[in-house]
Amino acid sequence: SLDKLVHSFSFDLNSRFGNNMSNQFLATYTSIKDMRGTNSDIFPFIDIMGGYDAATGVQDMTPYMSLGYELFTYNNGVNNKILTINDNFTYNLGAHKLMAGLSFEYQMANNSYMRNGTGYYRYRSLDDFLTGAEPEAIAFTIGYNGQTNPSAQVRFNQYGLYLQDEWNINKN
């Protein structure tokens, strides 16, 4: 399953000061939580392959059976938070329309992914699995410094200050 929660809010204030001045203040906030989920219990993923021919040394890589927690779902998710604020002041001077403004943007992205987070075991054959033979391949993903749900997080801020002159040369 893919649990996607999106929350978004905005605030817009438009003000007039006489006939030739106005201001717009706009703020928005968005939070996106996109977690991949499953109804499985945490259990290693096991691949049992189609068999191994000891005489020729050839491994049949066709999966005979696979079971366990899906390899790409454990601790797989993205969280984003975005805040934007804009404030624009406009002054009309006949042929010139001046606008001065400030802007601010904050973004945070948090991404987590742990392939093989519950462990992975691959057996050459059903017989190897049933007799307790050593797996042919094993994989574990362990978070840095022992973290159980590691993630990469990126944050940044962007500021802006601007002045614009909209000039109508001809009267229409």
Each model region followed by its residue ranges:
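Extracellular/periplasmic metallocenter environments
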Residues: 167
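Loop/turn elements at helix/coil->beta-strand transitions in domains of secreted/extracellular proteins
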Residues: 96, 171-172
